[in-house]
Structures are given as C-alpha cells and as structure tokens.
Amino acid sequence: MIDRQKVISELISPNTSKIVLLVMDGIGDIPNEEGLTPLQKANTPNLDALAKKSDLGQTIPVLPGITPGSGPGHLGLFGYDPLKYQIGRGILEALGINVEVGENDLVARGNFATIDGDIIVDRRAGRPSSEESAKVVEILNENIKEIEDVKITFYPGKEHRFVVKFTGEGLMDKLEDADPQKEGKPIKYTKALDESSKKSERIVNILLDKIKEVLKDQPKMNFALLRGFSKHPDMPKFGDVFKLKPAAVAVYPMYKGLAKLVGMEVVEAGQTIEDEFNTVKKLWNEYDFFYVHIKKTDSYGEDGNFDSKVKVIEEVDKFLPILLELNPDVLIVTGDHSTPCVMKGHSFHPVPLMIYAKNTRRGLSKLFNEFECARGSLGTIHAVDVMPLALAYAGRLEKYGA
C-alpha cells in the first residue's frame, strides 16, 4: 500500500510561506424548510469576496456514505488517513485538558446525562456550566477511587464533559461506547470487542453502576455516558511529516488534544472567535502553520438551532479581516464534517472547502456555500488531500518524477 504521507514528505521543499487552516466545525449542512442552509442564509460579505479569489470544492472526511466523528474528520484535514489512524475520543479529550496518559492508562470521554429510571432523557444534562460540572466531578472523585486493582480518576472538562482515567494492568481499549447516542433509549453498558478487553469491560460497567448510585440525588447530572475508550497511540508528528512549525488555536479540550496528538503546539487562545483570530495575529511571526478551530457551528447544528449557527458563521465573517490583513500565502476555510441542523447530528454529507492563495483559478465562484463548493474547481476530494494541496499552493512541493 502506498504511504501517502511518505510520498508527500519526500517532495517538500521548505520556504517562508504561511498557511492558515480555519476549521468551522460541522459547517456543512442541508436545506431547511425554506430551502436554505446556514451558509446560504448568513450574511458573509468577507467569505463571499474571498470565494471570488479562491478555489472551491468539497471534501469526503473518510469514505462516501461514512458519517465521521470529529477525530477522524480532523485527522484527515491534518493529512493523516483516518482509516489507518483510528483514535478514540477519550485520548483527545484527555490530552486537551492536560491529563497525563501512561502506558497502563485507559481513558474515556464522559458526558454528564439525565436519566429517568434507566432511560436517558438528556444526553448533556441540560448543558451545565463548567463550574457546575466540576463540582459533580469532585463528588465522583471523593466517592469512587478504585475498582478491583484499577485506580479511577475523574477530570473536569468544558460544560457537560469530563474525562475518566483507569490506571492498572491489563487494560485494553477495544470497547463499545457506553452511550446509546440518542435520548429516549435505555442506559447502555459497554461490551468488549475482543478477549483482551474483557477486564476493561468489567471495570467500566461496574463504574457505571457506581456513578448511578453516587449521583442518584443530583437534579440533572445523575448519570454519565462514556465513549471513545483509548490508550495513547503512536503517531508521526505533523511538523516532521510536513516540515512545518504548527500552532493550534482552539478553545475546546478535544481539539487541543487532537493537535497535541499530532505534535502541534497548543497556544492560549482566549474564548471568543475574535480572541482566536487575534492570537494568530499575535503569534504570526513565530509559526508557519496555524490550525484555528471554531466549535459553535457544530454545537448549534447538533442542537438543531439554525439561527444560532447562522450567527456564528456571521461572527466568523465579521472577524475574518483580522486573518486576511496578515496576508497568509494560503488560507483554507472548511469543516471537519457536516452537522445539518435538521438532523441534529453529524452526517455523511460532503464538507464545503475553500482554498485562497495567489495561484488559484480565481473567478469561477462567487459565494461560499455548499452548492457553490459542489460545483467548484477543486471538485470532490478526500479530506486527507487538503494538506498536500495546501503545501502545493504554498509552493512547498517539488515535482514528482522526471
């Protein structure tokens, strides 16, 4: 099998160009009852002006018809084949909040949830504040310290999210998610996918029962869903593969974790879109690749909140001149997957892609939205091809062959 990363890496000729990868999480959508997507509805003069000078297309994050998680969606954009590198969400969330993960550790991402009896009625427990969630994490740490010979530690994340770390011998990560993924479904326990993970299955399921008992008097955060069980994987570093000095500008822990996993330097980004863009401006001379992550487009898509998704897109557009004034050699605007508001979740639909550079076939597109991207000059490509294109537009790839 051809090692795409190796082929690209051997063609790279470093220069002084700057590349910005702006990921609007879950940006792709499908029309609502008015026949519009949030990108079509949004007032985006800056993105639309950029489209006239850019090459547009759409990406397939994994394979046609496959609905990707955020991990595979991002790995593809970073130039890693998501079918080769299968990463659990737990390690991403853990690294994102600076949890040390050793060789005897198994980690999982947790969602606080609300149950009525054994039925999940709210998978996010009403989206509590991070402060409220941290108090419940403290209760769990006080009451659940060990199961058999395995140490249990809980770590607070943002809002309803947390991380649980299992430390002990013989813990493997081939486990089903302990999350039914939908409300109105009964509690779901994990199952081992092979014999090596039977111990992990037993420990996790005992933990779920203990969490239920400890939190039974909590008004909303009275249960937890666990998913993305994972050990620490071994991966080539982004900077070594692509000969770039990368910085990650992200607010949410999981995306910081993704960046750390591939060796990007995670920088302090503030909390708002304006903060993130100003962080890029502040550090412009220190790095030559910037990954910038915008979360709320995905959050509002999952909530089915069309108008709020539109507002986030408009906010990105409002502050886009901060990035444009830096005059990047390559600016990529895309998403890691589609999150249609009408579906309230990730979907298999292709993802809008726009690449601005000085050497594009400008003039073919007039707007930035799903339909302009579908007929754009780049066509439909795999997300894993975005990084080679970025390097090519930046003048960093030599000719292949004689």
Swiss-Prot record:
InterPro entries hit by this protein: Alkaline_phosphatase_core_sf, ApgAM_prokaryotes, Metalloenzyme, Pglycerate_mutase_ApgM
Keyword entries, A-Z: Glycolysis, Isomerase
Enzyme's top EC category: isomerase
Record pathway: Carbohydrate degradation; glycolysis; pyruvate from D-glyceraldehyde 3-phosphate: step 3/5
Keyword Isomerase set for record: yes
PANTHER family cross-referenced by the UniProt entry: COFACTOR-INDEPENDENT PHOSPHOGLYCERATE MUTASE, METALLOENZYME DOMAIN-CONTAINING PROTEIN
Protein name (Swiss-Prot/TrEMBL): Probable 2,3-bisphosphoglycerate-independent phosphoglycerate mutase
Organism whose genome encodes this protein: Thermosipho africanus (strain TCF52B)
